[in-house]
Every structure is written in C-alpha cells, then in structure tokens.
Amino acid sequence: MVKFILVRHGEGMHNLAARTEGNKAYADPVNRDAHLTTTGIAQAKEAGITIKRQWPKATALWCSPLTRCIQTAMNIMDSVEVPANAIYLHDNLLERQRRTNVCNYRAEVKDIRNAWPQFNTDFVPDVSAHWQGEEQGHVVKLRMTMLLEHLKRVYAGAVDPVIIVCHQEALYEVLGVELNNAEYIVAEL
C-alpha cells in the first residue's frame, strides 16, 4: 500500500469569480489557466503547514500542470520536504475538460518549463487535452485511476507519502468526495 495525500488546489480566480458570476466565470478568458487568489495562496500555505505536522517529508509530488495547482504545490513544498528529482506534472491530473471552460486550459509546455523549471514535464504532452472537447466523468475516473495504479507500483514500499495536487472533479471521480479549496484526504491505496 502507498500512502497518498490528495490535495485540491487553493482558491483560484475562477472560483472567486464564480461566486458572483456563476458558471460563466469558467468560460471568461480572463480566467484562462486561473491563478490562485491571495486567499488561495494562504490556503495552500496552511495546507503545507498542516501536512508537515504529520509528514515533514514526501517521497514525491505529482501535480496537474494548471497554474493554480502548481502554485498550490509550491506553497505546500515551502513546508514539506520533497526530493528535487521527484516533482512531476502530469496531464492525467487535469480537471475535467469542457470545451467552454477556459479556466482549465493549461499553458504550453515551453511556457510551463520556463515558469516552473523545478517541475519535471516529461509527462505533459505538447498538445493540451482541451482540444478533445467535453470529457465525461467516467473518462476522468479512468485517467485518474490509471495514473494512481501506476504510482502505486512505482512507489510500492515507500516510507513517506506521495502528494498529489489536482482538482475537485478529478478527485471526486476517484474518491467520491468533494473537497473544498486546499482540502486534502489521506488514502492508502
């Protein structure tokens, strides 16, 4: 069994906008690849501090390549020690893809590499997943499950947990639980 700490990203600009604008906030170009709000940064920092109390070290960190998740991961890593060669981005951790939700359109790989050189982007294809259009829940569950099954094999026997930072719907599909911003669940899989 591998211990996973599954974290939803902190509050993003699109989450804040959705409180006043509703679902149209997700399609607003100003929220493309939404960044964390000031509140979201504080939430991510607090999650890192809380995680560190029980697990000061992690075996690895895997993260969605969307900016809000990377920012959440960076703030968690301010508290939790993660080996520099074990910090990864993976498209399987993206939020459920919907053609109109530009908040879930990630940056190009070259831009991600320039902005976040500490992350291994070998598992992020040049072409983003949003071109596929509407993604059904069972497809999200399948891609998340495939990655988790792979990580269970890779990290079998690990002493410290593996941290995964991603999105509400992606986590819901595998956990059956909706997490608030920067909430996390510890699961042995």
What residue spans do the PLM features occupy?
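Acidic, low-complexity terminal tails and accessory targeting/binding regions
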Residues: M1-F4, L16-A17, G22, A47, ...
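Active-site-proximal alpha-helix that buttresses catalytic centers in soluble enzyme cores
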Residues: V2-N85, R98, F119, A182-I185
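Beta-strand elements within well-structured catalytic alpha/beta cores of enzymes
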Residues: K3-V7, W62, D160-A170
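Short active-site segment of divalent metal-dependent hydrolases/proteases
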Residues: G12, A170-L171
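Short glycine/proline- and acidic residue-enriched helix-loop micro-motifs
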Residues: V30, N114-Q136
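Conserved AMP-binding/adenylate-forming core of the ANL superfamily
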Residues: L36-I41, E134-K141
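A short, structured active-site edge motif that brings together acidic residues
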Residues: P65, P83-C103, V124-W131
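A short, acidic, amphipathic alpha-helical segment used as a generic capping/interface helix at domain edges
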Residues: V140-A156
